[in-house]
Structure formats: structure tokens, C-alpha cells
Amino acid sequence: MSALVASSFILGGNAMASTNVVKSPLEAVSMVSEWDKAFSKSDKVDHKKVKFKNRYGVEIVGDLYTPKNLHGKAAAIAVSGPFGAVKEQSSGLYAQTLAERGFITLAFDPSYTGESGGEPRNLASPEINTDDFSAAVDFLGTKSNIDRDKIGILGVCGWGGFALNAALADPRIKAVATSTMYDMTRVMAKGYNDSVGADERYETKKKLAEQRWLDLQNGKPAYTGAINVDPKKIDASTPQFVAQYADYYRTPRGYHKRSVNSNSGESGWTKTNPISFINMPILAYASEMRTPILIVAGEKAHSRYFSEDAFKSLGNKNKELVIVPGAVHTDLYDNKNNKIPYDKFEEFFKANLK
């Protein structure tokens, strides 16, 4: 299977070339009051829904987790990811667990997805999504129980790349961690393991440009449809990492109805979503990084090379790469197999947010 075909399961590329319009039933949702997470609620932290705006005027909705019996000002961590997920999935679990360990944490839905605002729905942008992290810092820094000089961020999967990019742009971020990271601009432009060259990339750009005409003609964006495969259709020919994504997003293990990655019907990403990712690489100034860094990846993760390459390129000597023995990419989503090194994340943030 070519890297570009493999990417389609995650990026919607298999639907991208189609001229059929997929109608989207999506619209922004109001904040849900009940607990509807893919993980159990902790009795050690207080939880509430919050909202704030990013620099582009998009309203971001998040879950704020505060340790019970907190005294004085605390350090804070903003968490988001994976790419196409919602705060009720992996990022919320990380946030709640770190709050149990003494931090005030915020898990948020990126612009245009989940409960956050923005039209059209299910759109991503390397620039806007990078700013979503800085907007989270804006919000946290206004809270009376948070020391604004002790704010860090953590990005999971594709949001690992955005987290590093945000730390490069925003010196207010005092520590940055990634878990099972992707560089979404790299994989959309070059496919897995950089196997897509200029000619194939140009053909993709032509299809994306044609899709813009179709969207204009139809007065609305077309959508890719389901991002991850139906678990019932997985067989011996299915790439292992594709099956692992389905096992998380499309089963009770991690399913959430507002998640782009969990959808099984007409939505998915906008078909033109890759345009800016292909043309605007993140981490261009990686060598100038001055923020302390922790990068965590699974030993057996198909995505491991993103973490290792990012680690090599980042200039700060205060950096650490942790390879989790035996872990695949999605093992670091929900700790199903007890692979998430929470002790390491706690140690890192306590050492650098002081």
C-alpha cells in the first residue's frame, strides 16, 4: 500500500479526489452539561466547561480540571489532540490525570470542531490550530488561581506538532510536551515516511483546486466521509496501524459522536482540508526553540519517526526523548495497556513550571 493511500484512512484522501458532494449535517453545538467523556470522571478534581476566543475570533470550548482543595496559585497545562479527536477523548484523559497530580488543566476542542465554534465545520489549519494553544494560554493566564508564569502545553498525535509550533511562537509557554506526535504538515505534503514526491503532490494540489470550484458551485464544502474504517471490515490485508485507529475511534473504547475520527457517515473533514497543510510546513524555526521539551513516542508506533526527527531538529538542550517499550501509536491515547508514562509527564512539568 502506498503512503498516500495509507494516509487516506486518516486524512480523508481516499475521498478527496471524488467529485461527488457529501452533504454535511454538521453545525456548531451548544456546550453539553452532562458528563459524556470516553473515560470515567475522577472524584479527585473539579470539572467545569469554559469558553474563550482565539486571535481569529473563533470561540473555543474546553473542559477545565482543577485539583480539589487547591490552595494558592497553581501551574497550568493546556492539552489538545489527537488530530480529529475531541476533548472528551484522549486530551481530556491526559488533562484529568494531570489535574489529579496537582496541575490546573484545560482540554479543549480545536477551532471548527467539537463544541468549539467556526464555520465551515470540521476544518483544520496549521496556523489557526497553533494559535488555539496560545488562546488557551490567554485564558489560563487570566485565572486568579493560576500563575501565568507557570503555563505549559501538551499535544497528542497531530497536536504534538502544533504544540511544538506554538512553543516556538509564544514565549509565555514555559514547557511543552508531546505524546505519540505527528507533524500533520509533513504527512499531508509528503505521505508516510516522506514517500510522496513533487509530481504526486502536484496532482493532489490539482484535485484540491478543482474541489474548490465544486464547493463554490454547490455553495457549501464537500466532506470526505468516514475517516477511519469500520472495525467489522478489518481483515488480514488491513495495515496494522489502520486497524489500531479503528479499534480506538470506532469502538466503545474511544468513540465519541462529536469526533471527526469517530464519524461513520457523511461528515469527516472538508475535502479541501489539506491545502494549507501541504503548503505551510510547521517547525520551520525548530533550531531556535528555547522552551523545555519532552517528547514521548511508542517503540512500535508507525509515527515514531515524527518524534525522533522533531527531537533532532529542536535547538534547546533542555529536551528529552522517551521511547515507551512495546507501545504502538494508539497505546498512548487512553492507557488501555498502561503505556502512558504519566509519572514522566508529571516530573517534566513540575521541574519546568516552577
Residue ranges: model-predicted function:
Residues 97-117:
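Conserved alpha/beta-hydrolase
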Residues 289, 295-297:
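Short beta-strand/loop motif that positions the catalytic acidic residue
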Residues 72-82:
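Short beta-strand element of the alpha/beta-hydrolase
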Residues 84-96, 110:
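The serine-hydrolase catalytic nucleophile loop
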Residues 123-144:
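Alpha/beta-hydrolase active-site loop
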Residues 327-338:
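Catalytic histidine-centered segment of alpha/beta-hydrolase-like enzymes
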Residues 26-72:
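N-terminal cap/lid segment of alpha/beta-hydrolase-fold proteins
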Residues 164-251:
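Alpha/beta-hydrolase-fold enzymes
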